[in-house]
A protein has these predicted regions:
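ATP/NTP-dependent adenylation/nucleotidyl-transfer catalytic domains that generate, transfer
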Residues: 165, 203-260
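Core alpha/beta nucleotide-donor-binding catalytic domains of modification enzymes
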Residues: 1-212
Length: 260
């Protein structure tokens, strides 16, 4: 399938070419998938990158926008995003959270509902791959949140590029992309992204952590070294899990032998 002219024009930019190349190194799926689009810079950049990838690889790709109805303007925003994506032949469907909204734990419950809706859509279409826009800043935030909660090794490195959740593969191809690069793609391609006011609300733990990380960065935190630390912890966790599995198999074999 040919890449539409308006998408080809966007690909003529050198920085876009470089970011697309990096994306293709991290995304090697060869079957149909669903992409979650919120309207933020990360998910709009993901919509653009996956669209190019799906055309190049002749793959079926569906785009889903979830309207949580937590803000009065959310429905208009969802419609605007759908229209904007359509300009680039990215066909999106809007799913709506219709139930009564809770007064407490709103962010975590909205996240759970979003995944419920997305997983249902995956099952409806018999698609096992769901692609989401978590990026490097999310990886750092998740690490610090888990550390504050006293998580063990597995919890500290829980944000993986591929996570199996029942029958669904949750895929995060942007984990080594910085937020500023995703903002660049969104601005350059769509000249738009949604600024969610909850991203500035310091009553939410994630926003407090984000501000602390930014303070660390301003005081010399080396993001490359932090990324390397998380990468090394992941390797340690993988090694540990490997030996646990080996030990289980060995004990299972010995149990069978003893019973004989």
């Amino acid at each position: 399938t040919k890449i539409p002219k308006n998408l080809r024009l966007k690909l003529s930019n050198k920085k876009i070419q470089k970011l697309l190349k990096n994306f293709e190194k991290n995304f090697y799926i060869q079957e149909q998938f669903i992409v979650a689009v919120s309207g933020g810079p990360d998910s709009l950049a993901l919509a653009f990158l996956t669209k190019i990838y799906s055309i190049k690889n002749n793959l079926v790709c569906k785009y889903i926008i979830v309207d949580h109805k937590l803000r009065k303007e959310s429905t208009d925003e969802a419609k605007k995003i759908k229209k904007l994506l359509n300009v680039f032949d990215i066909k999106a469907e809007i799913l709506t959270w219709k139930e009564k909204k809770p007064l407490k734990n709103i962010q975590s419950l909205a996240r759970k509902k979003r995944y419920d809706l997305l997983f249902s859509k995956c099952k409806q279409h018999k698609i096992s791959n769901l692609v989401v826009g978590h990026h490097l800043d999310d990886l750092f935030e998740n690490f610090f949140i888990r550390m504050i909660r006293g998580s063990g090794l597995k919890g500290l490195v829980s944000l993986e590029k591929n996570t199996r959740l029942g029958s669904i593969n949750l895929i995060r191809p942007l984990l080594d992309f910085e937020k500023q690069d995703l903002k660049f793609i969104s601005n350059y391609v769509f000249n738009f992204y949604v600024n969610d006011p909850s991203n500035e609300n310091t009553k939410f733990q994630r926003i407090k952590i984000r501000n602390i990380i930014n303070e660390f960065k301003n005081n010399g935190l080396d993001k490359d070294k932090l990324f390397l630390t998380i990468k090394n912890l992941k390797k340690s966790n993988q090694a540990l899990m490997f030996y646990i599995e080996q030990n289980k198999k060995q004990n299972s074999f010995l149990d069978k032998k003893n019973k004989e």
